[in-house]
């Protein structure tokens, strides 16, 4: 499994993050993310992924989990290009870091990039 990991004490911040997924889940598992606004409290997001889910469906599952957990007054969460998720701060909100904490979903690679 490929994963882009960053550490809390050195996490860069950005106004928008892209999460790219590739592959099909070979077994049911969970993906755990942490979003931390600059000088703010972290929000952990855990996403359950069922076996057999392709990258586009994994992206939708992750989008839905972030949308349910994050305030719509502070962030927008959308699917982009089918297999990518974009998380953007709204105007007036602080930049934030995004990190992959853990994943036990086999055969799904996850890449996180600030934009």
Features from the language model and the residues they span:
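Hydrophobic h-region of N-terminal signal peptides that target proteins for export
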Residues: 1-8
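Polar, low-complexity export/assembly segments characteristic of proteins
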Residues: 11-115
């Amino acid at each position: 499994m490929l994963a882009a990991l960053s550490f809390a004490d050195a996490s860069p911040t950005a106004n928008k993050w892209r999460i790219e997924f590739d592959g099909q889940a070979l077994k049911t598992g969970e993906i755990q993310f942490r979003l931390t606004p600059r000088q703010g409290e972290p929000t952990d997001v855990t996403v359950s992924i069922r076996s057999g889910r392709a990258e586009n469906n994994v992206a939708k599952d992750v989008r839905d989990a972030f949308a349910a957990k994050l305030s719509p007054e502070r962030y927008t969460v959308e699917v982009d290009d089918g297999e990518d998720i974009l998380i953007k701060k709204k105007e007036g909100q602080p930049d934030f870091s995004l990190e992959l904490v853990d994943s036990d979903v086999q055969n799904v690679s996850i890449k996180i990039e600030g934009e």
